[in-house]
From Swiss-Prot:
This is Probable chemoreceptor glutamine deamidase CheD. Probably deamidates glutamine residues to glutamate on methyl-accepting chemotaxis receptors (MCPs), playing an important role in chemotaxis. The lineage of its organism: Bacteria, Pseudomonadati, Pseudomonadota, Alphaproteobacteria, Acetobacterales. Pfam families: CheD (PF03975). It is an enzyme of class 3 (hydrolase). Keywords: Chemotaxis, Hydrolase. InterPro entries: CheD-like_sf, Chemorcpt_Glu_NH3ase_CheD, Cytotoxic_necrot_fac-like_cat. GO terms for molecular function: protein-glutamine glutaminase activity. Its EC number is 3.5.1.44. It catalyses: L-glutaminyl-[protein] + H2O = L-glutamyl-[protein] + NH4(+). Coiled coil: none annotated.
Length: 190
């Protein structure tokens, strides 16, 4: 029998990330996985500290009304990003070495507000404002994606889903009813 490499994609320790979650790992055998429609996943890592993480977020339904300004929806997005960044810093990452890959933000339902574009725009603006370099990824479009991210190396793999994905559409929440949580204080920025 031929030995299998520890970081082989078929034998890695897979960790699924669902909407609203984030995860930070320093295990070279870990691979963070998610499925995205209009949601966005930010994959951040520090190559010097061999640590990385992924989040999976969707701006609440009132984001289209607040796209140009602050508001609760943008605070929710900033909170999701800061949770990931702060957790990376707690695990030894340095902010000045962080790299990013962004995925998702698809427009899955024609005729409705393109919440995927708003999610993608937000993620790009946030990282630019934080001075975190975006080195890759795949945003927008009309198809969902399956993402695998190796947090230690920063390697990522994307598989586009078939154009007709009714199961994925059912899994996405009704964007008109999803609302931002009420503000509960300031977000601590490092």
């Amino acid at each position: 029998m031929t030995p299998v490499a520890a970081a082989s994609p078929d034998y890695a320790r897979r960790i699924n990330i669902v909407q609203g979650e984030h995860r930070v790992e320093h295990d070279p055998e870990a691979v963070l996985c998610t499925i995205l429609g209009s949601c966005v996943a930010a994959c951040l890592w520090d190559p010097g500290a061999s640590v990385g993480g992924m989040n999976h977020f969707l701006l609440p339904g009132d984001a289209h009304a607040q796209a140009g300004g602050g508001g609760a929806a943008m605070r929710y997005g900033a909170y999701a990003m800061e949770l990931l960044i702060n957790d990376l810093l707690r695990h030894g990452a340095r902010r000045d070495r962080l790299k990013a890959k962004l995925f998702g933000g698809a427009c899955l339902m024609k005729g409705l507000t393109d919440i995927g574009r708003l999610n993608a725009d937000f993620a790009e603006r946030f990282l630019a404002a934080e001075g975190i370099e975006i080195v890759g990824g795949s945003l927008r479009g009309e198809r969902g994606r399956r993402i695998q991210f190796w947090p230690v190396s920063g390697r990522a793999r994307q598989t586009l889903l078939a154009a007709d994905q009714p199961a994925l559409l059912r899994a996405e929440p009704d964007l008109r009813t999803l609302r931002a949580p009420p503000p509960s204080g300031a977000v601590e920025l490092f």
